[in-house]
A protein has these predicted regions:
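Topogenic membrane-insertion module of multi-pass membrane proteins
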Residues: 1-74, 87-99
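Short, amphipathic, aromatic/basic-enriched membrane-interface segments that mark the entry/exit
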Residues: 14-21, 83-94, 111-116, 134-142, ...
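Alpha-helical transmembrane segments of multipass membrane proteins
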Residues: 30, 34, 103-107, 125-129, ...
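Acidic (Asp/Glu-rich) catalytic motifs at the cytosolic membrane interface
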Residues: 57-85, 134, 140, 181-189, ...
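Multi-pass membrane catalytic core of lipid/isoprenoid biosynthesis enzymes
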Residues: 70, 75-120, 166-177, 213-220, ...
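Hydrophobic transmembrane helix module of multi-pass membrane transport proteins
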Residues: 121-149
């Protein structure tokens, strides 16, 4: 018997399907605003529009992903409750929503610039390739995920018309690779705890858990090393009055990465580290501390 919820999914069901809680990832477009110190009305406005464009297109991608993985998700201990997998939203309605979301996303992108539209198109092409193929290839999947995060940073720079920083790109790539590996670690740990077999839609074995954890930590610490090298670069002297203060960011970042991995090992982190970070009190305090240190480094002597 079909329930009323399945016949008439409410706004909460649709918001869950659109993964509105994941929109925090698209705030990465603001990173170039912060690192370039472009706190103007124009820069912030364009960054907001860019964030909205990515959010709409990301929702379309999530919809496509769930349509492709609907059978596998129905066998997953947590993903089976997703609206499409559970039947709360009909697959037909999901297919209709995809072009609508994409049209709204690119209409927003056109307000920013044609270059931004091209970056958004590249993001969609890569994420589509990820959904169809790359997500099933060991390690290729996490590298592509890191690239998808980094593309958001690139898009943010293009949206506000500032040069791309090689330091920022290198830091972003390693940091996001670490987060992607943590996500895979959490997924494998969940399957082990529920006595599930090796994932059918991922090219990982349950025995890979330890090495995936090691790769996550090493990639995260590489990001910290890149940040430390950045502090000694000439670019820092042009942007910060007190660059020596930025050294304090290194131990804070090291602490957060190590703690996140330990919590993942203890099964105290959900499958997505970024979503975990915005709900975790210690992570929020850590982020606030880093922001305070950056502001102090910017302040005049």
């Amino acid at each position: 018997m079909v329930t009323a919820v399945r016949q008439n999914p409410g706004i909460i069901t649709w918001l869950k399907q659109l993964r509105v809680h994941q929109y925090v990832k698209n705030s990465l477009v603001f990173l170039p605003v912060v690192t370039s110190h472009q706190f103007t009305y124009r820069a912030i406005s364009f960054a907001l529009i860019a964030c909205a464009a990515f959010s709409l297109c990301a929702s379309a991608v999530y919809m496509v992903n769930d349509l492709l993985d609907i059978e596998a998700d129905r066998q997953h201990p947590k993903k089976k409750y997703r609206p499409l997998a559970s039947g709360a939203i009909k697959p037909l309605h999901g297919k209709i929503a995809v072009p609508v979301l994409l049209a709204l996303g690119f209409a927003s992108a056109a307000v920013v610039s044609s270059e931004f539209c091209l970056v958004l198109l590249a993001y969609l092409a890569l994420t589509t390739a990820y959904s169809i193929s790359f997500k099933r290839k060991m390690l290729v999947d996490v590298v592509v995920l890191a690239m998808l995060y980094t593309i958001r940073v690139i898009a943010g720079a293009i949206a506000i018309s500032v040069p791309l920083s090689a330091w920022l790109l290198a830091f972003s790539m390693f940091m996001f690779l670490s987060l992607a590996l943590m996500k895979r670690y959490s997924e494998l740990a969940l399957r082990i705890d529920h006595n599930l077999p090796d994932p059918s839609n991922r090219n990982y074995k349950l025995d890979d858990l330890a090495i995936v954890g090691c790769l996550a930590v090493s990639s995260g610490f590489n990001a910290v090393t890149i940040f430390a090298l950045y502090i000694n670069s000439s670019a820092v002297e042009q942007l910060y009055a007190r660059p020596e203060v930025l050294w304090l960011v290194c131990p804070v970042l090291t602490y957060w990465i190590g703690r996140a991995m330990i919590l993942a090992h203890r099964r105290m982190m959900n499958e997505d580290p970024i979503v975990f970070a915005i709900k975790d009190r210690v992570s929020l305090i850590t982020g606030a501390l880093i922001a305070a240190l950056v502001l102090l480094a910017m302040s005049k002597k």
